[in-house]
UniProtKB/Swiss-Prot annotation:
Mg(2+) binds at residue 424. SUPFAM superfamilies: Class II aaRS and biotin synthetases, Winged helix' DNA-binding domain. Its EC number is 6.1.1.20. GO terms for biological process: phenylalanyl-tRNA aminoacylation. It catalyses: tRNA(Phe) + L-phenylalanine + ATP = L-phenylalanyl-tRNA(Phe) + AMP + diphosphate + H(+). Binds 2 magnesium ions per tetramer. L-phenylalanine binds at residues 342, 381-383, 422, 447. This is Phenylalanine--tRNA ligase alpha subunit. It holds the Pfam family tRNA-synt_2d. Its cofactor is Mg(2+). GO terms for molecular function: ATP binding; magnesium ion binding; phenylalanine-tRNA ligase activity; tRNA binding. It is an enzyme of class 6 (ligase).
Amino acid sequence: MLGYNEKLVLLKLNEVKKARIEELVKLTGLEQVAIMRALLTLEKEGLAKISERKERIIRLTDLGRKYIQMGLPEIRALNVLKSKKKVKLDELRGVLTEDELKPIVGILRKEGWVKVEKTPEGLVLEITERGENPEERPIDKALKILSEKEYATSEEISKIVPINELKRRKVAQEEEVVERIAEITEKGVELVKKGIELKREVTSLTPELIASGKWREVEFKPFNIKAPVKKIYPGKKQPYRVFLDKIRRKLIEMGFIEITVDSLIETQFWNFDALFQPQNHPAREWTDTYQLKYPEKGYLPNRELVERVKEAHERGLAGSRGWGYVWSPERAMFLMPRAHATALSARQLAKGIEIPGKYFTIQRVFRPDVLDRTHLIEFNQIDGFVAAEDLTFRHLLGILKKFAIEIAGAKKVKFFPDYYPFTEPSVQLSAYHPELGWVEFGGAGVFREEMTKALGIDVPVIAWGIGIDRLAMFRLGIDDIRYLFSYDLKWLREAKLIW
């Protein structure tokens, strides 16, 4: 069904058969946007067709429009000469700018409008007979045409004056435009012959229409509710931050207490030694961790705790023989960007916990690695532990499986035996990603008694450290971990928020 605008455009097209969009604007009085919308509907119905052609056009510049109002510099200079007959060049400064004054003698002489005389006081210009009665020049004709419409074709103007002359004088510019031409089809002509009633349409039912009863007489414009509309991108939270907030809420709802900390820097004591990781372990070397150049060292905690950790390393605790080496407090003082969030679990255990108790933290950690779609050198890790009497390894597997399925949305989960200096037994958690295959989430285990006893804990503690960025990959349906920290507007706009 055709609306008012479509009918109006079709009737006008029937009168002229073919017209440019600009011509239809004048014929119908409609805006160009409304005409294009109407033509697209008519074309879809086979009543009109739209063709395009590229064309070079000439349009006035800002300087050109200024000269239309004031006159070209040579015309203004000539007007002064007509009244005074003879003037010094300096006398023209009142009507011309410095930029206009520089070429003015050459232009006036070329046109034959003046004679130039050199005097001790400077150049003197005297008007000629030709200057008294100047003919209209090609450039004047071209500017007059351009002043009467928005633009003219290059072909039209080039017949009057060389385009380069207009460009050189910076009064006009040449552009390439796409010209759209509408033409009525035979089907459109036949429809007009049958008769078209041009009746204004109403787009909304107002209280006035109802009260007056005129709603019975007017024609309401039909709306296509399936028509595509322009997408709107309102303010939106960063998808990954929303995911992290959801994890926090879920864990707190499950009774976990969050461990918060401001610093990204740890001493090796908390990152390694308190976790019963020997000082000669390869994971402490530059290939696996970063070190601070300045300041190089930090402070150790209270002496009693340091002595217990030293004893665990050198001679062992809880029936263990330890690592059997001389532990160095100097080595433990070196500062480093945190390599894993388990360092905060050790801090919390030493600080004191509720028993039974459940704790977690989400922290930024740093490790040397090769950047790819599943690895970053700076990433987030969720670390947690549960301390209670009678806890077993099977309790840990149950928590990990719940993490992978309920939080990450993984369909398949696997556990692999693993090794960590501070847990025994230890396990690796992996989940299946439809694009990447099996992806490692992180490690877990039961904290060794050499660690927990040194930190003052006498009950079993099950713990895990999981790359939460990889959990987010599953939940947000992406196959490149770098998207989580990306400025890609397309992804940020289209990514679903996980509440």
